[in-house]
Amino acid sequence: MPGLIRLPDGVAGEESAARVWSVDMVWLMKLPIKPVVLLLATAAAALAVPEYAVVVSEKTWADPAWKRVADALVARHAGATVIRWQTSVVETTAPLRAAIPRHVCFVATPAEATAAMVGDVHRLTRRLDDDPYTDVFWGILTGFDAENALAIAMESKPLTIRKVASGTELALDRVDEGVCYDELKQGHSVRKQSGQAPAVEVAPADTTQALVSALNVGAPDLFVTSGHATERDWQIGFRYPNGYFKSKAGAMRGEDTAGQIFPVSSHNPKVYLPIGNCLMGHIDGPDAMALAWMKSAGVRQMLGYIKPTWYGYMGWGVLDYFVEQPGRYTMTEAFFANQAALVHRLETMFPEVAREEVIGDMGECAKPVHPSAAAAGAGVSIADGHGLLFDRDVVAFYGDPAWEARLAPGPLNWKQSLTASGPDEWTLTITPLAGAESFKTINTNGSQRGGRPIVQFFPERLDPSHLKITSGSEFNPVLTDTFILVPHPGAAAPTSAWHITFQAEKPR
């Protein structure tokens, strides 16, 4: 019985038929008429306003150790629904479309959390309504083993990120305290103490031990990496000889250029952003780096490319939302704000191919990639179209998407607020805080930095059939049932507050 939705305990029904709803209508028609009627009625009621869904395969659900992972999520998230699939996660498209929960957690064993699954989840979560954007906050929750995955699922205390460690340059002025070891300049690092300005320091020529110590002793809340990587290692230096982080069977170790070994053992809950690394999100077996980060380094949420990265929009752009707008977004929200930015760029600059889903390793698809007039005016090329298509579905998000990890409040270049301005009417106000510098790129390290649209998520889903911009249309806002997106204002950005007002209703 593929694609089952588990209804809340206590729902009545003959022979427990009302406890599940199947997406397989052929199977459904085989049920006695009375249970079918009751089944559909209770399913509709149960799915009216869902907040959280756990998606899991029948095989994983049948494994007691992994079922405890799913059960832990159900226990933590009130009213959570369980959707089960048999042969492919794509089977869950119909029940998710019927429910459209705010959060969807795909519980998967490492053997299931493949590159194919990541791509399938990206695509199916854009198909839940008529707009081209991702419709839910989703994450794939896995671990080196069920015990590791359970620890991730049980993490409930929100994480306020105060301490950051990085193997690449960051905007440290936006964080409370942190250290960056430069992957481009040997011997160069920057450190920020709480309450002080960032200061340049001399770093060791080989930073392997320093980075392991930053994890083991420094216990950062956020760890960031870039540079060359495979599923088995991270090459610390990008432009100069340096050591490695390597993984095997869930264990992580640093290995410097002299062959010295430094085991990683860092168990404080943290989030990890390998924003510029190839393959760090590709789980291809028990020795995968992603699993070692979860098992040996305390990672509760992370993103990661499942293929070699060459464009970078979907990775590096998360810094623009998460680190450079401190406190505004959770890590989940920052990931999906950047995803919305990418989809918007495709829809605006390359509308003829924006919804193509079969994409090659160099961003090729069945149709020729032609920039729109808007793209030509913005200096966007055919290569950008291929890069955006490639990046769209090749970055995984691992962890419970409802778990909140956000930076401690810090400097912001603009303020954005969403307020009720009347019955079923809302106003987004954007107030520049840095004058003419308010919307300039903060940090240029990496690839495809800056120029991101303003994204404001709504506290709850709105009725997509009752959305209308009533003022501020000159800013070309995009209004969906879960967020409003305002394109980056560019050089013509106002230096005083500006407003966008829209009508919207909550689902009845």
Predicted features along the sequence, with ranges:
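Cysteine-dependent hydrolase recognition
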Residues: 49-508
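Sec-dependent signal peptide recognition
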Residues: 30-39
